[in-house]
Amino acid sequence: MYKIQLLSCIALTLALVANGAPTSSSTGNTMKEVKSLLLDLQLLLEKVKNPENLKLSRMHTFDFYVPKVNATELKHLKCLLEELKLLEEVLNLAPSKNLNPREIKDSMDNIKRIVLELQGSETRFTCEYDDATVNAVEFLNKWITFCQSIYSTMT
């Protein structure tokens, strides 16, 4: 009689783990990764907003897309990952003393690594983007706010 309940419980647990559901032991790691992502995005924003980067003024004319719905879950990071490629290309168009191509690549690679770790095995999510676009500063601010929100709900 209890075998069926036990097997059901095991099957449910395996299904949750296979689908990337966070476990209690991973919460601490997730918090560290979200905090790390937040710091990387803030650092990138500082460099983009730096007034010494006059060459980057044209960068602010490029349009970036943000999710149609408010990003509230880690699965929404897929949308960041998709637009991050464009941001990296735009930043490489206007290298400056504060933002050289090697730093850009290192920063982007680190952000991508963190996002992939936070996403886990969730690959079925499809991003739906808002029709309105934002500039690079607004784009980074949006994702910084997202990270702050996720981090605050975990503490």
Swiss-Prot record:
Answer yes or no on keyword Signal. Answer: yes
What keywords appear on the UniProt entry? Answer: Adaptive immunity, Cytokine, Disulfide bond, Glycoprotein, Growth factor, Immunity, Secreted, Signal
* One GO-annotated biological process of the protein: positive regulation of biosynthetic process
Glycosylation site list: 23
Residue stretches in coiled coil? none
Q: Which GO terms describe its molecular function?
A: cytokine activity; growth factor activity; interleukin-2 receptor binding
Query: Domain of life here?
Result: Eukaryota
Q: Where in the cell is it found?
A: Secreted
The protein's matches in SMART domains, at most eight in alphabetical order, are given as: IL2
> Which InterPro entries has this protein been placed in?
4_helix_cytokine-like_core, IL-2, IL-2_CS
Listed GO CC annotations = extracellular space
- What family is it from? Belongs to the IL-2 family.
Q: What is this protein for, i.e. what is its function?
A: Cytokine produced by activated CD4-positive helper T-cells and to a lesser extend activated CD8-positive T-cells and natural killer (NK) cells that plays pivotal roles in the immune response and tolerance. Binds to a receptor complex composed of either the high-affinity trimeric IL-2R (IL2RA/CD25, IL2RB/CD122 and IL2RG/CD132) or the low-affinity dimeric IL-2R (IL2RB and IL2RG). Interaction with the receptor leads to oligomerization and conformation changes in the IL-2R subunits resulting in downstream signaling starting with phosphorylation of JAK1 and JAK3.
Q: What is this protein called?
A: Interleukin-2
Q: Give the organism's phylogenetic lineage.
A: Eukaryota, Metazoa, Chordata, Craniata, Vertebrata
Q: Which gene encodes it?
A: IL2
